Each structure stands twice: as structure tokens, then as C-alpha cells.
């Protein structure tokens, strides 16, 4: 009798464990056939988001969710495209301040020419392989952008930003991390309050501002460069034959150029001003906490 009772308890425990696991983990899936001209809008209270452009005319939505009894995910098609929402329900306002126990990840495939608008309060953003505009905002994670041909506006309050192979005007903001960009052919406007900025192989007009780190920029074509930092060095790499008018000044180090400048003004080795190859678009460099180095691009 005791043996049978023990077996019953074990079986009952397994059933409860399986039931609890099922309740704590579930998924959401939906797909829509779409026409050119629409866009994707995603607005969620919590969750990381990954969006990939495909050679298709479908929007395919998949979400993996933990502790999802308190998250209501919905997706609908309308005249402007597809809208996806994720809303936390059934929790007190105090519980809503801490959503770390809710692990949610959205994975969405869209047509390559489908513009996307993303907003999440609790996760990272990853967007790849689009020939359309991107707008993204997160309060709690990093941002990754790759192979985007179109304008970009993205900001995060809690992570770094990494981007590669961009072709379009790009505006990036972060309050808590570094910004790294490789291979960009559009205008760049980037700003961080808490990290370094690294721009490699970029074209277009460049504006980069940081309050808490160094700035490194390798610029292939000079269409105007504006680099400032309050807490680090500035290193600018330029082609030897580029035309530029350079104005570089530091309050905490030396300003120097390994490229020959004409009409050079040097004030106590902290202020460097001159024309490169006869002059051209202005290059403005300022730092309060480090040296400035202008070097030839190898």
C-alpha cells in the first residue's frame, strides 16, 4: 500500500511540474500576406526583437515567451501594414516596474522592402537585411543593425549600438554604451552619454558626440566631419589626397597631424588649424580630456 501511494505521489508531482512548465512557457505564431507599400509596427512592454528581411511577400511573426500568463501578444493586418503588440496584464503597477522575470523574444521575417517601426521597454533590437527605413527604440538593451539600405533612427537607454553595411542617413543615440559602425555610405549623426565611438570605413557627413569616451573615425570621403568628446582622445584617419579644412582643439592634451597642412596655426600645441590639399569641407575636432591625432589612412 505504501509503495502504491509513493508511486501515485511521484506521478502527481510529474504532472504538476509538466503543467507548471507549460504554463510558464508558450509561443505565439502568425503570418500575413502583404503588398508593397505597407510597414511593420511593433510595440511591446517587454521583449527582445529580431527582424530579418526576406525575398518574400509575407510577414511571419514568432514569439517565445516565459512567464507569459501576464503578457498578451496580438498581431493584426490593416491598411498600413501589420501591427504587433505585447501588453503586460494582470499585474500591479509595482510589479510592472520589474519585468526581468519575463523572458520574451520576437522573431519576425518581413519583405526586404518593408519599413519597420519598433518599440520595446525591455530588450535588445536586431534588424538585418532590409532595403527600407528603420525606426527603433528600446529602454533596456543593445541595438544591432546590419545590411540596411534606408534611413535609420534608433535609440537605447541601456546598451551599446553595433552596425555594419549601412546605406542611408543614420541617427543613433545611446545613454549607456558604445557605438561601433563599420562600412557606412550615408550621413551619420551619432551620440552617446556613456561610451566610446568607433567609426570605420564611413562616407557621408559625420557627426559624432560622446560625453564619456574616445572617438575613432576612419573617413573615406570628406563631406564634413564633426567629432567631439568630453572624456577621451580623438583619432581621425583620412585618405592622403582628401581635401579638407581642419580645426582641432583640446583642453587636455596635444593636437597634431601626420598629414601636411598649409596655413597651420598652432597655439601651445593644443590648437591646430590648417588646409589639407588646398582645403575643402570643414573637419571640426574638440576634446576636453585627451589628445587629437589626424593620421593618413593605410
Positions of the model-derived regions?
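Intrinsically disordered, low-complexity terminal regions
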Residues: 1-298
Amino acid at each position: 500500500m505504501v509503495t502504491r501511494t509513493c508511486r501515485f505521489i511521484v506521478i502527481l508531482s510529474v504532472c504538476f511540474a509538466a503543467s507548471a512548465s507549460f504554463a510558464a512557457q508558450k509561443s505565439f505564431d502568425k503570418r500575413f500576406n502583404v503588398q508593397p507599400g505597407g510597414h511593420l509596427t511593433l510595440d511591446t512592454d517587454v521583449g527582445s526583437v529580431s527582424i530579418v528581411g526576406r525575398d518574400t511577400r509575407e510577414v511571419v511573426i514568432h514569439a517565445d515567451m516565459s512567464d507569459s500568463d501576464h503578457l498578451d501578444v496580438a498581431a493584426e493586418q490593416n491598411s498600413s501594414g501589420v501591427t504587433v503588440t505585447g501588453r503586460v496584464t494582470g499585474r500591479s503597477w509595482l510589479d510592472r516596474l520589474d519585468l526581468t522575470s519575463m523572458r520574451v523574444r520576437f522573431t519576425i521575417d518581413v519583405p526586404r522592402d518593408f519599413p519597420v517601426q519598433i518599440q520595446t521597454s525591455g530588450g535588445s533590437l536586431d534588424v538585418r537585411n532590409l532595403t527600407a527605413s528603420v525606426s527603433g527604440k528600446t529602454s533596456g538593451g543593445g541595438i544591432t543593425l546590419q545590411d540596411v539600405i534606408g534611413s535609420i533612427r534608433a535609440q537605447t537607454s541601456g546598451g551599446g549600438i553595433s552596425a555594419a553595411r549601412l546605406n542611408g542617413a543614420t541617427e543613433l543615440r545611446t545613454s549607456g554604451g558604445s557605438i561601433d559602425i563599420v562600412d557606412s555610405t550615408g550621413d551619420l549623426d551619432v551620440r552617446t552619454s556613456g561610451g566610446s565611438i568607433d567609426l570605420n570605413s564611413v562616407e557621408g557627413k559625420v557627426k559624432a558626440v560622446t560625453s564619456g569616451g574616445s572617438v575613432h573615425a576612419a573617413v573615406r570621403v570628406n563631406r564634413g566631419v564633426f567629432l567631439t568628446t568630453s572624456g577621451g582622445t580623438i583619432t581621425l584617419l583620412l585618405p592622403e589626397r582628401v581635401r579638407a579644412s581642419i580645426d582641432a582643439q583640446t583642453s587636455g592634451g596635444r593636437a597634431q597631424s601626420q598629414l601636411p597642412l598649409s596655413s597651420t596655426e598652432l597655439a601651445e600645441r593644443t590648437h591646430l588649424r590648417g588646409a589639407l590639399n588646398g582645403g575643402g569641407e570643414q573637419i571640426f575636432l574638440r576634446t576636453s580630456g585627451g589628445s587629437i591625432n589626424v593620421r593618413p589612412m593605410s
